[in-house]
């Protein structure tokens, strides 16, 4: 069961994670001086943690960007990496970035006053994209990508890259994520924030010890949306649990160990980032998500999970109609949102096969 929990947090397939063929990432810290956020607040220093796999070639044209998802680190795409997978590090240079608010990149928990804890500014998906654009262009001297691949909040970033920088990448892949957080998704996130902040220990974010009751309530509420209803009915959690594991034990594991060590303000910060995502609010589109999607120029592989409760396939189907060069390929899985991160062998194969084929075109 703990392997499954870790898999869902990091999106590191336990099958890929144990493979000797993975070229494990080298970790770096990129510092942006006086980083101005969309809200107008300026951080004297903003840190972006990232990892790299493989080597940048002399032409500097073999780079692939892998932006992280909710509370994940730079290891979140190892299910795609290695011999026999879609991303071969003997040929490609992979850059895996970490979102603001994950506890490693600049976050409420690791930033000094006056921006510590609940005073840390809300960071939008565009803030994250702009920071990574500076990393690529100014620090790594990469002005063009071979591909960009994102899962969940990484998919949100993929959509924003496609709109903000329509010529920056040859191809883009989005799995289990949409171009906008629609009202139902916003309500879900607010429910999870409410569960977390109801703990009196939370104290409006100025807590002196972790709000354990709130964190446990958050874990249970989040878990209810993670998989499909049929996944639970068929008890597919047994495929990754020790023999004899009970349903009560599964729930308790999610309640007490969902994101070990996570800071409550960090969790909330990234939920606010998620809530505000909308490519239609990019400058020049006046809030029109359809117009923003129509502006996407490059081939776009759109892979929603057929049973995702976070990003329903109906939302993805609606959006796909406005992307000129879309390949719409739903993942036929019962694993809900997690299907987009290869949470089981069948989904891992489906993703790798389709992404590898897309990148070869």
Predicted regions and their residues:
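Catalytic-loop region of hydrolases
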Residues: 17-66, 74
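Conserved acidic catalytic loop of the alpha/beta-hydrolase fold
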Residues: 115, 126-147
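Short beta-strand/loop motif that positions the catalytic acidic residue
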Residues: 296, 302-304
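N-terminal cap/lid subdomain of alpha/beta-hydrolase-fold enzymes
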Residues: 51-114
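Alpha/beta-hydrolase-fold enzymes
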Residues: 168-170, 174-257
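Conserved hydrolase catalytic core segment
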Residues: 143-186
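Catalytic active-site module of serine/aspartate enzymes centered on a nucleophile-bearing elbow/loop
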Residues: 318, 325-361
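Conserved alpha/beta-hydrolase "acid-adjacent" motif
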Residues: 309-315
